[in-house]
């Protein structure tokens, strides 16, 4: 009986134990909140910001020898020259790092950032927009214009008129070649530091130009258009004309011929005209060959008609 009662008691205890609910598991501890590090917001059009950023990039590049600078409101990049090898460094999304670039060194003029007034890029953008008519995705670039002169320029996307600035931040003037001042400035720009040319001239719808020998079989042209600084182009043409001193060409003499044509009713602000100055007559003294509308005139360097 005792054994039977004990067995019954053990069975009962086992059944009760099997029916008992296990204690609930402990509540999990809350996970710590992860906070992203904010990316520094820098507006490079604010006064002083662009210059500070370019200097920061130069410090990373470890050389001040620049061949290109690019600046927008949100990012900046520089291309430097190291032993005829280019490196590009950029600041984007709060990070400064070396980046891939298709910029190569083809004897561009090397410059330093302190030669350029980028203390207020926003002001340059405002001036450029007043001329181009667009604020869209403005970008400032500092680079050799191809004629050895380094200018600042502001372009937009979609593309509008590119606006150029001198290194000190003053605006490159737009030239009107139907005025004496436009003629004077255009000639001054294309002559630059040259003392001789094989040909020199102006075209009302193109600009001022100067030709000089490149190699024995090429001629180089310097061109200043109404809105773009001097550029150069080398063409396969053997220079056959005799060089002459460009100091002999006076802008007022060119204007005198145009003024005379105006008085005779052959020249207005919309009249297309051109003049080429060279020694094609083989006299040893260059002459000025004008085409004004449909009229042709040949003069000496003082503007007096010949023949």
Tell where the protein language model's regions lie, with residue ranges:
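C-terminal motif of bacterial Sec signal peptides marking the signal peptidase cleavage site
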Residues: 14-18
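Exposed beta-strand-loop-beta-strand "reactive/processing" segments of non-cytosolic proteins
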Residues: 59-84, 142-161, 191-216, 273-298
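Extracellularly exposed regions in secreted/surface proteins, prominently low-complexity, repeat-rich
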Residues: 155-195, 232-239, 260, 264-307
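Long, acidic/polar, low-complexity amphipathic helices and coiled-coil-like
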Residues: 68-72, 77-81, 86-177
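Long, charged/polar, surface-exposed segments that mediate recognition or autoinhibition
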Residues: 100-136, 230-270
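N-terminal export and membrane-targeting signals
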Residues: 1-11
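Bacterial signal peptide processing site
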Residues: 19-23
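Extracytoplasmic low-complexity, Pro/Thr/Ser/Ala/Gly-rich segments
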Residues: 26-102, 175-209
